[in-house]
UniProtKB/Swiss-Prot annotation:
Entries under InterPro entries matching the protein: BAH_dom, BAH_sf, ELM2_dom, Homeodomain-like_sf, MIER/MTA, MTA1_R1, SANT/Myb, SANT_dom
Matches recorded under Gene3D superfamilies: 2.30.30.490, 4.10.1240.50, Homeodomain-like
Annotated zinc fingers (GATA-type), start-end: 378-402
UniProt cross-references to PANTHER family, sorted A to Z: METASTASIS-ASSOCIATED PROTEIN AND MESODERM INDUCTION EARLY RESPONSE PROTEIN, METASTASIS-ASSOCIATED PROTEIN MTA3
Source taxonomy: Eukaryota, Metazoa, Chordata, Craniata, Vertebrata
Identification of the protein by name: Metastasis-associated protein MTA3
Domain BAH: 4-147
SMART domains: BAH, ELM2, SANT, ZnF_GATA
Pfam families with a match to the protein in the record: BAH (PF01426), ELM2 (PF01448), GATA (PF00320), MTA_R1 (PF17226), Myb_DNA-binding (PF00249)
Positions carrying Phosphoserine: 429, 518
A GO cellular component entry from the record: nucleoplasm
Organism: Bos taurus
Keywords of the record: Cytoplasm, DNA-binding, Metal-binding, Nucleus, Phosphoprotein, Zinc, Zinc-finger
Gene: MTA3
Domain SANT as annotated: residue spans: 266-318
Protein's job: Acts as a component of the histone deacetylase NuRD complex which participates in the remodeling of chromatin. Plays a role in maintenance of the normal epithelial architecture through the repression of SNAI1 transcription in a histone deacetylase-dependent manner, and thus the regulation of E-cadherin levels. Contributes to transcriptional repression by BCL6.
Length: 590
């Protein structure tokens, strides 16, 4: 029973689809709806398969930089299978919340911030264990590091001088190191200073009465007097008193100049009501993450202003009321919920009584169960025997997984063994809405084929950026020098076989010294049409003897300077070969 009891703060699996992997979430709240059902407010975590390839490359680059900084080579000691399974354990934290039915919970798991001091094998050895190091924002598609930095160095810390010996004097000039703002040995008594501060508060209250914006924010006299009693008014009055040599008359004259009384306002008064509401909303969403609050809610405010306002806001009655309200809500909310073991998965292939099981719940599409020894093997571990089989992938592919690999697929979002089809599989595209297009793309991805454009605007893939490949002089020279190694015609027939550039570069380096003096042969260029016409006029070709017809059958013919080629189809006996069409026979005859 304890295994099926879920509490606030637990990391759990959620099932939103019978064929897709589980969602990994953290329970923040458990709320009971009006219908009596229990809903869980959860924090979202994302897998590698849920984000784009561009962000995956950034995440791998970040992991590589961390590995280089720590000077560890743990990744090099891992096998291909371990590296493949380690990617399934990586998650990306987000600040996104959602509400899901509590009945969709399928089990507990553990998620922790990546600990650089531990070996990555510790995450593979533990079941249902995941780690994260980056924060993913699904709205703007960005990745950020979820940890602070230790600011060490002279830029952030003071240089500690060496300890002075007994009787040794400090040669530093203290006036340059410190600024004196108050003298405790002043000629004024404490009572006189307190009376001066009362006058300063009265001046601040009168200044707020004259200021239009302050009178709107503090409509009553009590609120104006409370605002005038804040620290900024007292600090300004004490600083004024010190700068005027503790002369009360001159200090009061500075507080009340000719233009009107001096008004000192802090961040609590500078912020408007709408800005205060935005701050409370951001604080509810992000907590005390002031950088995110400034970036998403208050970009026109400085970080210093936001932090100063936060600590002043904690001294107000509104903060105390919200704290009591949250405590009362927490007492009334559910602390835990019991979710019984759910019904079997619909993708389970039933072989009882010879009845076929539905594949992926498709209507009218059935999968004929075969003998495990004669049927398809598991798509992950290639096992032929299992106590239970599950349909996996598109219905028409009739792929299946054994019970062990199916549980691994649901929990970790991938197949156990690294396969070529999974390496070449494209990430899921949430923009594709046509189910036929989705099944076609998944079918091609499972077989390791690149997805091609079908011509439909719905399935059209974004075109890549156009580029121009400019061949250098040395590349052209290498094509002639390294013909035997390059074999351009054979390489053109096998476009997916890579060319050994190292061998070509080595041969080019060996033969470049011998052929450096010989010039590069230029290709023969075709002469312009005007030159050819002039040559034919000067050297006309001999006309063959042709039997002339009778005058009655003669038809007027027009002379042409160049005969147009006849493109009509020839008979089988009169068909020309490839060399004749390309003019190779005339060269051989000459």
């Amino acid at each position: 029973m304890a295994a099926n009891m879920y509490r606030v703060g637990d990391y759990v699996y959620f099932e939103n689809s019978s064929s897709n992997p589980y969602l990994i979430r953290r329970i923040e709240e458990l709320n009971k709806t009006a219908t009596g059902n229990v809903e869980a407010k959860v924090l979202c975590f994302y897998r590698r398969r849920d984000i784009s390839n561009t962000l995956i490359m950034l995440a791998d680059k970040h992991a590589k930089e961390i590995e280089e900084e720590s000077e560890t080579t743990v990744e090099a000691d891992l096998t291909d299978k371990q590296k493949h399974q380690l990617k399934h354990r990586e998650l990306f934290l987000s600040r996104q919340y959602e509400s899901l039915p509590a009945t969709h919970i399928r089990g507990k798991c553990s998620v922790a911030l990546l600990n650089e001091t531990e070996s990555v094998l510790s995450y593979l050895d533990k079941e249902d264990t995941f780690f994260y190091s980056l924060v993913y924002d699904p709205s703007v598609k960005t990745l950020l590091a979820d940890k602070g930095e230790i600011r060490v160095g002279p830029r952030y810390q003071a240089d500690i001088p060496e300890m002075l010996l007994e009787g040794e004097s400090d040669e530093r000039e203290q006036s340059k190191l410190e600024v004196k703002v108050w003298d405790p040995n002043s000629p004024l008594t404490d009572r006189q200073i307190d009376q001066f501060l009362v006058v300063a508060r009265a001046v601040g209250t009168f200044a707020r009465a004259l200021d239009c914006s302050s009178s709107v924010r503090q409509p009553s006299l009590h609120m104006s007097a409370a605002a005038a009693s804040r620290d900024i008014t007292l600090f300004h009055s004490m600083d004024t008193l010190y700068r005027h040599g503790y002369d009360l008359s001159s200090a009061i004259s500075v507080l009340v100049p000719l233009g009107g009384p001096v008004l000192c306002r802090d961040e609590m008064e500078e912020w408007s009501a709408s800005e205060a509401s935005l701050f409370e909303e951001a604080l509810e969403k992000y907590g005390k993450d002031f950088n995110d609050i400034r970036q998403d809610f208050l970009p026109w405010k400085s970080l210093t202003s936001i932090i100063e306002y936060y600590y002043m806001w904690k001294t107000t009655d509104r903060y105390v009321q919200q704290k009591r309200l949250k405590a009362a809500e927490a007492e009334s909310k559910l602390k835990q919920v019991y979710i019984p073991t759910y019904k079997p998965n619909p993708n389970q292939i039933s072989t009882s009584n010879g009845k076929p099981g539905a594949v992926n719940g498709a209507v009218g599409t059935t999968f004929q169960p075969q003998n495990p020894l004669l049927g398809r093997a598991c798509e992950s571990c290639y096992a032929t025997q299992s106590h239970q089989w599950y349909s996996w992938g598109p219905p028409n592919m009739q792929c299946r997984l054994c019970a062990t690999c199916w549980l691994y697929w649901k929990k970790y979002g991938g197949l156990k063994m690294p396969t070529q089809s999974e390496e070449e599989k494209l990430p899921p595209s949430p923009a594709t809405e046509d189910p036929r297009v989705r099944s076609h793309m998944s079918r091609q991805a499972m077989q390791g084929m690149p997805v091609r454009n079908t011509g439909s605007p719905k399935s059209a893939v974004n075109t890549r950026q156009a580029f121009f490949l400019h061949t250098t002089y040395f590349t052209k020279f290498a094509r002639q020098v390294c013909k035997n190694t390059l074999r351009l015609r054979q390489a053109a027939r096998r476009p997916f076989v890579p060319i050994n550039y190292a061998a070509i570069r080595a041969e080019y380096a060996d033969r470049h010294a011998d052929l450096s003096g010989s010039p590069l042969k230029s290709k023969s260029t075709r002469k312009p049409l005007a030159c050819i016409i002039g040559y034919l006029e000067i050297h006309p070709s001999k006309k063959p003897n042709v039997i002339r017809s009778t005058p009655s059958l003669q038809t007027p013919t027009t002379k042409r300077m160049l005969a147009t080629p006849n493109h009509t189809s020839l008979s089988i006996l009169g068909k020309r070969n490839y060399s004749h069409h390309n003019g190779l026979d005339e060269r051989l005859m000459k």
